[in-house]
Structure formats: C-alpha cells, structure tokens
Amino acid sequence: LTNERLKNVMLQLDDDLSDVNQVHSLLSNDINLVLSRYKNENWYNYQAAQRMNEYTVSNSFIDTIVYVDNKTDSILSSGKHVYKEDGIYYVYTGTHYLPFPMMQYTDSNKSQLIFLSDETSSLLLYLPYNSNVESYSIFYVISAKDLQTTLETGSFNGITSACLVTSDNRIVSGIHTDTIRPYLDGLVKE
C-alpha cells in the first residue's frame, strides 16, 4: 500500500513534468517567440514576454519561464530576474543570484532536472532537451510550492516523510525531511 502511494506521487511528478513539456512544445512554436527570434525588435520581444507570462500563469508547476536567444544573447523571463555573465546564467532567488552553467547541460540528449543551491537558497530548474543547432534555449524554474504540494499529497496514511533528492542525496524538496535525512547520509550512490 505504501509503495502504491509513493508510486502515485511519482506519477503525479511525471504528469507535472509532462505538462511542462507540453508548454515547452507550444512555446517553442509560438509565433510571438518565433518572430522575436527572427526580428529582434522591442515589440516582438514584448509580445513574446507576454505569451511567456500567459503560459506561466496557466501552469502552476512553473514558477518562471526563461527564454534565451543564443544569437543575440537576449534573455526574456516571465518572473525571476536572469542575467548572463562570462557564459554563466544567474537566476535570482528572491535574496540573491544562483549561478546556472547551462552550457554544461546542453550536450545531453535528454531533458534534465537541475538543482541549484547554496547555503541559504535553492532552485529546481527543468531544462528540456534542445538540440545544439537551435538558436535559442528555454528553461523553467519549477514552483517550490507546487512541488511541495505534490509531495504532501502522498504523506498520509502511514507515509510520514517523502522527499525528492539529487543523485548525490541532497534534498530538493520534502516533508518531514529531518526524519529521513539520517537514512540519506547512509545511502551509497548506485
């Protein structure tokens, strides 16, 4: 029964990411973003930013959509401030910026969840697969609140704690993480 509940949480996370992929597909083909790519003019960038805001509002799992034009180095964001310096993107957490070395992840042939963190803040990013021949990149900041809600839905009837962890056992999000942390310290990466 517990395994079934945990499986349901995993399925919900998978559904949430599938919804982000659907937004990504729609956004990649959105005429406003296409025009902003080929006619780097303020009006088209404004229209593209408006569409990104609409897509962000329509999916609560997305906190921010970030669109990067790789030709012009222009950045559009539907929420958090993002800038680029020396090839590194910096994403504002609400108190300071976390570095995101996106180029380290673009050679993958898979979509990726990327956890950025320091001593005081963290962000979970979703970077959909993007071929290196594309002239743009889009990544998504996942809503910490909605991720937490998804994990909380599985925390009833015998499940006292649940968390999403990185491959090196850092907790991305969870409920009652203090009870599970001692077990994570003893896990060996497979």
For each predicted feature, which ranges?
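Soluble sensory domains of the PAS superfamily and closely related sensory modules
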Residues: T93-S111, D185-E190
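Conserved beta-strands of PAS-like sensory domains
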Residues: Y90-H96, S117-S155, S173
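Intrinsic low-complexity, intrinsically disordered coil/linker regions enriched in small/polar
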Residues: D146-E190
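N-terminal sensory and localization modules of signal-transduction and trafficking proteins
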Residues: L1-K7, L35-N40, G79-Y83, D107-F115, ...
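Residue-level signal for well-ordered, solvent-exposed loop/turn and beta-edge residues enriched
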Residues: D73, V133, N169-I171
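A structure-centric signal for secondary-structure junctions around beta-strands
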Residues: N21, I62, E134-Y136, G154, ...
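Short, surface-exposed beta-strand-loop junctions and turns on beta-sheet-rich folds
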Residues: V82-K84, S131, D178-I180
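Extracytoplasmic/periplasmic sensory segments of membrane signal-transduction proteins
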Residues: T2-P101
